[in-house]
Structures are given as C-alpha cells and as structure tokens.
Design a protein with these regions (language model features):
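Domain-level signal for soluble alpha/beta catalytic cores
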Residues: 1-180
Length: 180
C-alpha cells in the first residue's frame, strides 16, 4: 500500500499571519515571543490540515521564519565571518537574511528557476561545520506531541553545496564529508 506525504507546506499562513508578525517584530512593535507563538500556531494548523486530509507522514522542519536554506546554514554552523560577532542568535539570523547597519545581507537567488528565493550559503575551503539540530528536534517533538507521524525535511548536503557560493573559489564539494 502506498503512503502519502508532501515535501513542504506553505508557511506564511492563509491570512499572512507570519508576514505580519515578522514585520511587527522588525518594527519593534512585537516581541520575538509573539512571533514564536504565531509560528507555533501556524505549524499546528498546517499539520492538522494535513492530518485531516489523510497525509500519512506529516512534514516537519519545513517551517521557517525566513528561509529553509538559511535554517540549514544555521543548523550546520556555516555562519559567514561578518556575522559571527553577533551573539544573539535571533538577531544574527535576521541580520544574515536582511543585513543590518554594519553588515550586508547574504545574497538571495532563485530556487531552481522558481519565484522562490533562498539565502545563498557562503562557503570557503577551510570551513568547519558545527551542527545544531535543536530546531529539528523541537519541531519533531512538537508534532509527536500532537499525535502525528512526522517525517523530517532536510536540504541534503549535495544540494546545500551545489547551491552555495564558494567565496574563495574553492571546490565546495570537497567539504561534503565534513558536513556528514
């Protein structure tokens, strides 16, 4: 018997709830806790929708506050040097995406010629990866607590490297083993 799953679910919310929460946060009119509450509500709504429509394996780690590739960059600890000095993880995450007064944002480009844009990883030959899977684990536990059968979505290492920018011109695929 075949099983069903989807690769990912639109995350913005049918009334653009995530967009409005993020804009309020960036404008200083909402706390990050409020953004996280909106995000959790949306994840739960989207998971329940899939369950109600008889999807066998509910995707988790497909929700992002900004970009799934940016989440993968953070998960791998592939932080460009200009952002390393930002201690607050939330501030660093959004500075990488949007830039700040001292730093240019990371480049964005089209995801496989679609209208979706992703943050381009900046890779160099001597990069050391420091994996942090806490976001993935937290969302998996969150889905299991709702009685769901979640499957974890990941951008694979070859896709990550193939879509990266080798800032020093190095062979980025030489880093494949270090990601694993």
């Amino acid at each position: 018997m075949s099983k069903t799953y989807i690769i990912g679910f639109p995350r913005i919310g049918e009334k653009r709830e995530l967009k409005f929460a993020l804009e309020a946060f960036w404008a200083g009119n909402a706390s990050f806790e409020e953004v996280k509450t909106v995000a959790k509500t949306l994840r739960e709504r989207h998971w329940k929708y899939q369950q109600e429509h008889h999807i066998d394996f509910i995707s988790c780690n497909d929700f992002s506050l900004y970009d799934t590739m940016l989440d993968t960059i953070v998960m791998l600890g592939a932080i460009p040097p200009r952002f390393v000095g930002i201690e607050d993880k939330t501030e660093r995450y959004f500075a990488m995406a949007r830039g700040d007064a001292q730093r240019a944002a990371m480049e964005m480009t089209k995801w496989f010629n679609t209208n979706y844009h992703y943050i381009v990883p900046e890779i160099h030959a001597h990069m050391t990866f420091h994996v942090d899977i806490s976001k993935i684990v937290d969302e998996y536990i969150e889905a299991k607590a709702l009685g769901l059968n979640p499957k974890i979505n990941l951008i694979g290492p070859l896709t990550f490297l193939a879509l990266a920018n080798p800032v020093d011109g190095s062979d980025i695929f030489s880093l494949f083993d270090s990601i694993l």
